[in-house]
Amino acid sequence: MIPSTISLSAFRPEHLEGALRLSRQAGWPHRLEDWQMALDLSAGFVAMAANASTVLGTVLMTPYKRDVATINMVIVDEAARGRGLGRQLMKAVTTLAGSRALRLIATGEGLPLYQKLGFCRAGTIVQHQGQVLHVAPPTKARPAESRDIFGILELDRSAYGADRRDLLRTLAKVGQLAVLCNGQGLTGFAALRRFGRGEVIGPVVATNADDGKALLAYFMAEREGRFVRVDTAESSQLGAWLADRGLVRVDEGIAMQRPVVARSSCAPLTTFALASQAFG
């Protein structure tokens, strides 16, 4: 039960500064612009201190049409923990998500709560970042053109299992897209945008690891000495390749789903890097 001095309300733009305070307290790299993008694509709640109008907790739900949603930006102020705020925020946002299948990336600290709410482990997500070393430019990737967007949407839908057109159109506006072609059509794509301390590459979708590396290399080759982040599934086995190019492993999270949806072992496309831990 929420203490009488704290209330939940819809997450609105006027709460962004308070949310930024919480993410900085948690040691997250998000800028105000990163929070704004998350809110533009999402809906959610804040826990507010009734007397001081202080944001004490946040949660967002990013819907991908009516089938899937990610739960993200779950933060509770250090001074307000132990009161059940995390549980109340999660209950509110899962109700908001309705019948959608839910996905999230958990910290070890949040894992017990998510398990109690019916989420199950679905893998490990590894955060790589650092200053890019010299990377040779690939020969088979090119900048995306406006006519490529429909093919990109289909590639992502096949790899992710949901329609993320709003996210991808936003990435096309605020960042850059690159694609791979085989002469008959698109076979992979990657996105890059400003985020946190520098830039993030993702999503990266391809048919095999070599193509995934080529798409990553396309953006990394132009960014020697600059700070770049990549979030990838541990199962992608890109860790050593990224570390050799300056992006070292610094953290990891636990991918969780409710309900668990098994990925086909013969699926033609793989997501080699996430758009972010918030967006999947």
Regions found by a protein language model. Name each.
Residues T5-S99, A106:
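Active-site-proximal cofactor/substrate-binding loop regions of enzyme domains
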